[in-house]
C-alpha cells in the first residue's frame, strides 16, 4: 500500500498479550515490511494551534479536517537509516489521505518555529511536495499551528504490497512528552506512558 494512498483507518486497543497473538495471525497471511522484519521505532511530533483547533475538530467530528505531523524514522543500530518527513493528515467524510514531503531532520526545528525550511522551497521539488508546502503555509505560517506533543512507539507493520489495499500495524511501548525537544531517531527519552497498562494499538 502506497504511503500516500487514500485509506479508511480503524484503530483498536488490545491488551499486549492479545495483540501479540493477533500479530502472529496477521503475520501468517500478510508480508512484513521489507527491511523492517523485527520492527522499527516511530517518533512523531503533532501540531495544533493555541486554542487546540485540530483537537476540537476531531472531538466534534468535523467531516473535513487537516492536521500537521512531523515524523522521523531510523534505528540506533543503523539498519534503518535516519529519515524525516512533514505530513498533512487529511480526513474527509471518513476517508483519510496522507500527503508528505521528505526533508532533513534538522530542518524540522525551523518548521516548529513557524518557518518553511529552505529545503522545502527548492525549485526542483515535485508538484506533490509543493502542494504540501502550500498547506504548511496555511496551517503553520498563517494559522499558527505549533508542536504540542511528541510521541514514541515501536511498530511492526504488515503490508499487502504496492498494488494492495491492506496495511496492518501494531504499535507498542507508547510514550510521550510535552517538552518539545529536537526530534532524534530512536530517541528513548519519553518519560510519560500514554496508557497505564501495556497495550497494542492495531
Positions of PLM-derived features:
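Phosphate-end processing signature that detects enzymes handling 5′-triphosphorylated RNA
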Residues: 1-201
Amino acid at each position: 500500500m502506497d504511503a500516500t494512498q487514500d485509506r479508511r483507518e480503524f484503530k483498536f486497543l488490545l491488551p499486549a498479550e492479545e495483540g501479540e497473538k493477533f500479530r502472529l495471525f496477521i503475520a501468517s497471511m500478510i508480508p512484513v515490511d521489507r527491511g523492517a522484519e523485527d520492527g522499527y521505532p516511530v517518533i512523531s511530533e503533532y501540531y495544533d494551534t493555541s486554542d487546540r483547533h485540530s483537537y476540537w475538530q476531531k472531538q466534534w467530528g468535523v467531516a473535513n479536517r487537516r492536521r500537521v505531523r512531523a515524523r522521523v524514522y531510523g534505528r540506533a543500530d543503523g539498519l534503518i537509516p535516519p529519515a524525516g518527513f512533514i505530513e498533512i493528515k487529511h480526513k474527509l467524510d471518513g476517508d483519510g489521505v496522507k500527503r508528505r514531503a521528505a526533508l532533513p531532520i534538522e530542518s524540522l526545528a525551523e518548521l516548529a518555529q513557524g518557518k518553511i525550511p529552505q529545503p522545502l522551497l527548492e525549485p526542483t521539488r515535485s508538484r506533490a511536495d509543493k502542494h504540501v508546502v502550500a498547506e504548511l503555509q496555511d496551517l503553520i505560517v498563517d494559522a499558527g499551528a505549533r508542536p504540542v506533543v511528541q510521541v514514541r512507539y515501536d511498530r511492526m507493520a504488515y503490508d499487502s504490497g504496492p498494488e494492495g489495499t491492506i496495511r496492518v500495524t501494531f504499535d507498542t511501548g507508547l510514550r510521550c512528552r510535552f517538552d518539545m525537544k529536537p526530534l532524534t531517531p530512536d530517541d528513548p527519552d519519553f518519560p510519560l506512558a500514554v496508557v497505564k497498562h501495556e497495550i497494542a494499538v492495531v
